[in-house]
Amino acid sequence: MPISTINDSISESSVHKSSIPTKVEMSQNEKYSEAPSEAPTIPPPPEQYAWSRIRENCQDAFSEFFGTFVLLLFGDGVVAQVVLSRGTKGDYQSISWGWGLGVMLGVYVGGKSGGHLNPAVTLANCLFRGHPWRKFPIYAVAQVLGAMAAAAVVYGNYKSAIDAYEGGPGIRTVIGENATAGVFCTYPAEFMTRTGMFFSEFIASTILQFVIFAMADSANIGAGPLMPLGLFFLIFGIGACFGWETGYAINLARDFGPRLVSYMLGYGSEVWSAGGYYFWIPMVAPFFGCAFGGFLYDVFIYTGPSPINTPGMGFGRLVSPRRSTWSNTYNANSPV
């Protein structure tokens, strides 16, 4: 076959192939013979909802609020049951168990924020673990409000029992045989001196923070995921061994919040003056105690990032803090 014939054949074949339609045209009737399928509705991502944005921005405050709320529900609740039943539904060790459970469950609830549940613990984390100082007032306010809300719930739940115990509706006493103010906040034993009151709270708070840092230290044995359970035994131990003299408040939010609620509910100004104006000691001593407990642990045991493990033991940072000191010094998650 001549080359020209072959070329003609190939050319003709190419023409025929190129003439094959690549798109099938549909008539108007065919186009609309079937209803178009609806596209699936995809909900917007959670961050686009207004409440989701609020929850994200206020996550720490909500976590501390509800964590402290749960702590006080169990803590004040067990005191109410033991006191108002006149010891028939529990005893002093029941109170230690109840507070231990309250802390454990509160840490589970408030774990996203670190589960501090205590302004003094938050302070220690700001001082020694790089927790942002700008978050300290947010945590403290949320903790106090959570404690107040829980105290109000406990009061509402036990109001009838309080009336019966006190001797009638509207009778509310702070000191005396039928006093019920101690259900909500702590009052010292009658024999305690002012110095003894302070050091009782100081020592218990020092133990609290020292052991918390030990359990949170991954370079030590550490509690890991069992941290809430470890805190249960820690609080139970403090209550069982150091709680009699002052009631082991060891927490401004736990004491001041319910004390304020009891004042508002009719217990009167004696909630502030009782025990020689004892009310300020649970507000101040835990800060000194937790700071000292954290200091002791970092000086003698801790080897991780801490102002104690810097030149001058962090004193230079205290007298001339850098901006990072007030945001997030170590860029690390704050332990409990």
From Swiss-Prot:
Phenotype on disruption: Leads to no variable phenotypes.
Placement of sequence motif NPA 2: 251-253
Primary subcellular site in the record, as a coarse category: membrane
Locus of motif NPA 1: 118-120
Stretches for region Disordered: 1-46
Pfam families: MIP
Reaction equation(s) it catalyzes: H2O(in) = H2O(out); glycerol(in) = glycerol(out)
Membrane topology designation: Multi-pass membrane protein
Localisation per UniProt entry: Membrane
MF terms in GO: glycerol channel activity; water channel activity
Any GO CC annotation of this UniProt entry: plasma membrane
Keywords annotated in UniProt: Glycoprotein, Membrane, Repeat, Transmembrane, Transmembrane helix, Transport
Extracellular side: 86-94, 157-195, 245-280
PROSITE patterns hit by this protein: MIP
InterPro entries the UniProt entry points to: Aquaporin-like (IPR023271), MIP (IPR000425), MIP/Aquaporin (IPR050363), MIP_CS (IPR022357)
Keyword Hydrolase: no
Gene3D superfamilies: Glycerol uptake facilitator protein (1.20.1080.10)
Amino acid composition bias (Low complexity), ranges on this chain: 9-19
Function description: Probable water/glycerol channel that may have redundant functions with FgAQP4.
Protein name: Probable aquaglyceroporin-2
Gene that encodes the chain: FgAQP2
